């Protein structure tokens, strides 16, 4: 009788331990590889103080480590090739790749690497990190919204995030044509990652 009771207690503890392990696994940090076809880096600048001109960086890459239960363990890395700048005007894009602006020959990447992630509210996070452009690295802090998550038709689990923020291009040494092109650059980044 005593042996049977010990056996039942042992089984109960074992099942409880399994539940704890599996529940912790369910909320462990997950790594997502950015899907370049569904990730956008869009920017806008004001031309002559009159109207906005929009552009984008095609084919951004990177990864997101997301820990829903411990957001401080999350991390983001993202890169875009400066040669992939695209404003839908070939002549302007060629100029943007020149030493006057992105200097794509010498500085092929613009990149961001997070240093901290903090949850602000449901689906909203504060991400601080380093933005590198033209060989200069500057700290930035942005508010990021989790926009959705779920399986795609092929069985991959995807997660989306979006942020909008502004920088001054002069902070990175890009000061050509300051009167004709605004110093302030507004950016929107929409990222979709595939769980690995």
Regions found by a protein language model. Give the residues of each.
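Bacterial N-terminal signal peptides
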Residues: 11-23
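Bacterial N-terminal signal peptides that target proteins for export
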Residues: 2-14
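Low-complexity, acidic/polar, glycine-enriched regions of mature
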Residues: 27-196
């Amino acid at each position: 009788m005593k042996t049977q009771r010990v056996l039942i207690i042992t089984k109960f503890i074992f099942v409880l331990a399994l539940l704890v392990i599996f529940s912790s696994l369910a909320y462990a940090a997950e790594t997502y590889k950015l899907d370049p076809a569904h990730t956008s880096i869009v920017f806008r600048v004001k031309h002559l103080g009159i109207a906005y001109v929009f552009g984008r960086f095609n084919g951004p890459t990177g990864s997101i480590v997301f820990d829903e239960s411990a957001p401080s363990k999350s991390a983001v890395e993202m890169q875009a090739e400066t040669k992939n700048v695209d404003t839908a005007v070939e002549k302007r894009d060629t100029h943007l790749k020149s030493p006057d602006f992105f200097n794509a020959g010498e500085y092929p990447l613009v990149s961001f690497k997070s240093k901290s992630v903090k949850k602000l509210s449901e689906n909203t996070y504060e991400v601080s990190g380093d933005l590198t452009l033209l060989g200069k690295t500057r700290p930035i802090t942005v508010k990021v919204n989790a926009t959705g998550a779920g399986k795609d038709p092929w069985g991959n689990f995807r997660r989306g995030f979006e942020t909008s923020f502004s920088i001054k291009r002069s902070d990175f040494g890009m000061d050509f044509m300051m009167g004709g092109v605004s110093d302030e650059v507004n950016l929107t980044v929409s990222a979709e990652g595939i769980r690995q």
